Design a protein with these regions (language model features):
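Conserved phosphate-donor/acceptor-positioning beta-strand/loop module used by diverse small-molecule
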Residues: 56-77, 112
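Residue-level preference for the first positions of well-ordered beta-strands
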Residues: 33-35
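Acidic, metal-coordinating catalytic cores used for nucleic-acid/nucleotide bond scission
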Residues: 37-45
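Conserved catalytic network of the ASCE P-loop NTPase/AAA+ motor domain
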Residues: 25-29, 53-58, 102-104
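C-terminal alpha-helix
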Residues: 124-130
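Conserved substrate/cofactor phosphate-moiety recognition/catalytic segment
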Residues: 1-30
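Small-molecule kinase domains that catalyze NTP-dependent phosphoryl transfer to phosphate-bearing small molecules
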Residues: 79-124
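Short, electropositive alpha-helical surface patch
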Residues: 44-60
Length: 130
C-alpha cells in the first residue's frame, strides 16, 4: 500500500492487514495452508487472523519468535534487507517504541527462541505445525 502511495500510519496499517486477511481467508476456504509473517503487536491485529480462521472454519496457530538478546536483536535489525524500498527498515528506536506498546497475548500461542540457529528455529516451527 505504501508502494502505491498511501501514507504511512495506523489507518494504512489496518488496511494492509485487512487486505492480507482477505487473501488469507480466501486461501483457507480453499483448504490451503497460509503463513502470515506479521508483528501482531495488538489484540486487534491478532483478531484479524482469528477472524480469517473462523470464517474458514480453520484453526489458527500463532508462533511468536522471541529474541531477548538486545545486542543480537540490534545486529539483525541493522543487517536486515527485505528489498522493499517503499517500506524502509525500522530504526532501533522504532522497534523499542513498538515493544513498549506491545499488548499482552490473550489466547494460546507458541513461543520460539529466535536466538537459536536458523536450522533449530525451523525445526522447532515445523515440529509445532505438524
Amino acid at each position: 500500500m505504501l508502494g502505491a502511495g498511501a501514507e504511512r500510519g495506523w489507518t494504512t496499517g489496518v488496511a494492509a492487514y485487512e487486505a492480507v486477511r482477505v487473501m488469507a481467508q480466501d486461501n483457507l476456504v480453499r483448504g490451503l495452508t497460509v503463513v502470515v509473517d506479521a508483528v501482531n503487536d495488538s489484540e486487534a491485529a491478532r483478531n484479524t487472523w482469528r477472524r480469517a480462521g473462523a470464517a474458514a472454519a480453520t484453526p489458527v496457530l500463532f508462533i511468536l519468535l522471541r529474541l531477548d538478546d538486545e545486542a543480537e536483536h540490534r545486529r539483525r535489525l541493522h543487517g536486515r534487507e527485505r528489498g522493499m524500498e517503499h517500506l524502509g527498515e525500522p530504526t532501533w528506536d522504532e522497534v523499542q517504541g513498538r515493544a513498549e506498546a506491545y499488548e499482552p497475548w490473550i489466547g494460546p500461542y507458541v513461543e520460539v527462541d529466535a536466538s537459536q540457529s536458523l536450522a533449530q528455529v525451523v525445526t522447532r516451527v515445523l515440529d509445532v505445525i505438524r
